[in-house]
From Swiss-Prot:
Expression by tissue: Constitutively expressed in green and etiolated seedlings.
Name this protein carries in UniProt: ETO1-like protein 2
Taxonomic path: Eukaryota, Viridiplantae, Streptophyta, Embryophyta, Tracheophyta
Annotated function: Potential regulator of the ethylene pathway, which acts by regulating the stability of 1-aminocyclopropane-1-carboxylate synthase (ACS) enzymes. May act as a substrate-specific adapter that connects ACS enzymes, such as ACS5, to ubiquitin ligase complexes, leading to proteasomal degradation of ACS enzymes.
Species of origin: Arabidopsis thaliana (Mouse-ear cress)
Source organism, top-level taxon: Eukaryota
Annotated SUPFAM superfamilies: POZ domain, TPR-like
Amino acid sequence: MRNLKLFERFKSTQVHAFTTQDSPSTSSNGSPRMMKFLGHPKSKSRSLLPHGFPTTDLLEPPLDSYLKPIDLVESLSNLYRRIESSSESEASMLYLEQYAVLRSLGDAKLLRRCLLNARRHAIDVPCKVVFSAWLRFFRREHELVGVESMDCNGLASECPKTSLTHGCDLNVDDEGCECSTVCEDEFGSDDVKISKADEFSGLDEVSDISFCVGSEKAKCVRSRIAALSRPFEAMLYGSFVESTTSEIDFSENGISIEAMLALNIYSRIKRVDLFRVETVFELLQLASKFCCDDLKSECEARLAASVTDLDKALTFVEYALEERTTLLLSACLQVFLRELPQSLHNPKVMRFFCSSEAKEQLAFLGSECVFLLYYFLSQVGMEEKLTTDTMLILLERTREFARTNWQKALSLHQMGCVLFERKDYKAAQFHFRLASSLGHVYSLAGVSRTEYKQGKRYSAYRLMNFLISNHKPHGWMYQERSLYNVGVEKLKDLATATELDPTLSFPYKYRAVMKFEQKQIKEAFQEIDRLIQFKLSPECLELRAWLYLATGDRESCLRDLRAVLSLEPNYVVFGGKMRDDLVEALTAQCIEVESEADCWVRLFDRWSAVDDVASLAVVHQMLQNDPSKNFLRFRQSLLLLRLNCQGAAMRCLRMAWNLATSEAERLVYEGWLLYDMGYVEETLTKAEEAISIQRSFEAFFLKAYALADKNLDADEISCVVQVLEEALKCPSDGLRKGQALNNLGSIYINLGMLDQAETAYKNAIEIKHIRARQGLARVYFLKNQRKEACEEMTKLIEKSCSKAAAYEKRSEYCEREKAKEDLDMATTLDPLRTYPYRYRAAVLMDDQRETEAVEELSKAIAFRPELQTLHLRAAFHEATGNLSLATQDCEAALCLDPNHTETLHLYSRSKDQASSIDNTIFGLD
């Protein structure tokens, strides 16, 4: 049902920003001088320099703070083999390693799956607690208003109660969490009086021994107390004097009479949930002293369940460390971790994690658990862009508890990155060198950068030269060397970097600024536009906004600034904090105040022209004019998804959820958030709940979207048609109805109802849903009207601002040479699209140019190792008899998707052939 998808979700990659932190011209907030500048429309670009305009001397790419294997395919292949052959106790940390390796791809769903698998295979409670909190943080649930950190959201993998049980939970996320069906407070109130325990059976047994605390007595049953542990049994039935007396003085044991009374009750009914927390603490001490294992476990569980907020966690954690009670400590850690990122800024929490005492006391959990704990904390800190002393301590703890090479290399490299941001270049260089000595070659880029920052430009250049000469070249190597090169050689390095890895932002930005400085204004815009049309980021839009402002085009500048704020509302730009009054000042100078109707007309126009950046800007303006129009935030999220800005899209959805004015509206947004995580059944449930409250277009649309994602037969697919028809009966605007009609056409195609599909697409086109031309072209093609199909796609190309997908699709309806031209154009416009590489490789393979076919696929794999491309290259290797490389590509592909049926078959076949050849050779020997 892929045809029903509205949005193409590409795997996002690391954004490379230009940094101006070393620039003396950067102002603190940018507003006073900027306001002055706004009064001069004809100002030249040079007058912008004091305001922080990026010059070529100031531009440099940031150092990536994650693992970057020198051969990612080989690393993935190796990981897959180790995961497949791992024991139950090894699997969890291998999935964590997979997460660390795949961070460079930036695929949120893939990374979440790694964490989920790690959580499923985790055995120890502390590890389960960390993974559970990590999964929760990954979804940014802390941004949802009204959701408490210790709430269960219905997902078993993130449930705070489920995490506190020992052992693997391999099916933890296949079904919803059942904890909501259990009584919320299964332990009762702390204020329950012990006297009420008389209501329980078993308490009427006659007492035959008393434990005295001062003048008070706790009457007990000798046999029941003896059954609690061997020490008690020896004391009460052994050769000790206590075995022959009916009263035992316990005054010197530091135990209160209330605790002894509680011990009596526990010995009879085996429950501790009746007692106050203070009493349970005493029972736990007594259990530790007299080796009452069952009592100790019960007390730990009771205390762990009572740790429900930060204050209690801070109170209990010291005791948990002193008594080395794993469960209670895990419960305290869980509260700290589920409060992230806020707890990173809590002095008491950070004092605990950063203290040398805690480091020593936490060690009893095992180095694996403690490494995981500090790794998670440090990753949250990296995402929060912390460069404080606390951040360095967290990374240092991560390094201290690291045991494998990848763990040590990653923590050292990240310490280098933080120290580099702090401008402590000598210390940063030391850590980068250590990381590189452990096999992390990318850390040498950090070494060369710190050399450069310390005035050793030639030394930095030589190091990168050595790297390029001794390893398979990567785009980042040439990008890094370009910083230390000059003139024509610098531009050659940048060109090579773009050729090897077109996703790198820095080369485009450098060339754009350079051309602008050389007064090649048109070429400067073309250069930055090349990047923006396939990889949208705040940094790139910011640069283009500067160019527009410098050339006096304030309207285009304002459009890009609004898009920047849509992507990142708190983005720092123009040498200081982006402020609303700057946008307002530009608005006042660009256009007259638009009415709501004018904005809708403009949004309709830009949406229809597939001008997503301009559409984002209009939606931002409409929200600024009237923030109460919450449905616009949902539209914003759709646009951001289409632009492959998944993080920003999910933030918009969370904001819409927070500001929803009705339960039905909130359920729809919650459904989309669940859908994005892959929870189709839960999404359907939310859609049904929303429909039961209020029949709305968005609720029916969500239901249809989720249904179409399931494996349905023909009868079930027809249900999707009915749901979409119900959606179209509900009030909505033309933009959304156009999308519904477009989806309806896709369903009709799947059902073989081509005439109905044609009607649906034409109706969508009538209300200016231009993307429906792609569906209409498909209908014509299926009706053997290839010429008409090609013409429809040509119309889409002519009318659309974003053309790469249209060129790619038109290639399916053209003759071979024309198809190749279209696919070449698609690659030029959007090098992230992998289908053109696969098509060209298949053509080369058909022409028996096997080496060139493999090289074509290798180009794409070098910067985007995607499943289908790896599978195809594996098939080519198999066809040419290179079975070892075929196996390696299959393993790398299966590391991305272990259930991909075709790759599994190819992998099995390649291994069988290789084994057969080995056996033949062995027989000849």
